Design a protein with these regions (language model features):
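Internal acidic/polar
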Residues: 2-5, 91-120, 147
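Sigma70-family region 2
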Residues: 13-14, 40-41, 51-68, 88
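Structural recognition of an alpha-helix C-terminal capping motif at a helix-to-coil junction
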Residues: 33, 47-54, 67-79
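Helix-turn-helix DNA-binding module
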Residues: 4, 125-136, 140-161, 175
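Residues within the DNA-recognition helix of helix-turn-helix
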Residues: 27, 165-168, 172
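Short, charged helix-capping/linker segments at alpha-helix termini
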Residues: 13-22, 32-51, 159, 181-182
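Arg/Lys-rich amphipathic alpha helix in sigma70-family domain 2
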Residues: 61-64, 75-96, 116, 168
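Short, Lys/Arg-enriched C-terminal cap helix and immediately downstream tail that follows
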Residues: 86-89, 130, 135, 170-182
């Protein structure tokens, strides 16, 4: 673990408000981007990011430095996002049952609009069309530049499984993009 991270963690554990503020400022953007890339909803991502940072601060005593602080925090974020996705699926089922009465249209945020307008628009849509088990490793690897070892740690799966899921996801992307050009 980096000495600066260790010092920051110790200050946060002691309740130092400036250290807590520094922790949040340091990791908030990365956590938000990860949540947005998983949830594809800026409001949900903002809530998930706040929840992740708060959960991490509350659980600092359980952080032992086996992985980097960022990897540990990303693990918390992925778990919170998974819970939110399950909740979204339940809500969606309820909406379908109620015949769309509860459906609400949302306006994309500026960041979402930028992502949608970039040249990778087709790739982004294809990634979000994947199931969670393949989407999350792709997002962590290519949008957050994490190593296979870090992804394995976050998802609590063997590195070989990460490699396999990445390969499967790349094949799926290739097929979807190939069909889109036809």
């Amino acid at each position: 673990m980096i000495v600066m991270d260790y010092h920051l963690i110790e200050l946060c554990r002691a309740g130092d408000s400036s250290a807590i503020e520094h922790f949040v400022q340091t990791y908030q953007q990365d956590v938000y981007r990860l949540a947005l890339s998983i949830l594809d909803d800026s409001s949900e991502a903002d809530d998930a990011a706040q929840e992740s940072l708060l959960a991490a601060l509350r659980a600092l005593d359980s952080f032992h430095g086996a992985s980097s602080l960022k990897t540990w925090l990303f693990s918390i974020t992925v778990n919170i996002c998974r819970t939110r996705l399950q909740t979204q699926k339940r809500r969606e089922r309820l909406r379908q049952i109620l015949g769309g009465i509860l459906q609400v249209t949302r306006t994309p945020s500026a960041e979402e609009s930028t992502i949608e307008n970039e040249s990778g628009q087709a790739i982004w849509r294809a990634i979000h069309g994947m199931d969670e088990k393949h989407r999350i490793p792709i997002v962590l690897r290519y949008y957050h530049d994490l190593s296979v070892a870090e992804i394995a740690s976050i998802l609590q799966i063997p590195e070989g499984t990460v490699h396999s899921r990445l390969n499967t996801a790349r094949r799926q992307l290739h097929e979807v993009l190939k069909e889109g050009r036809s």
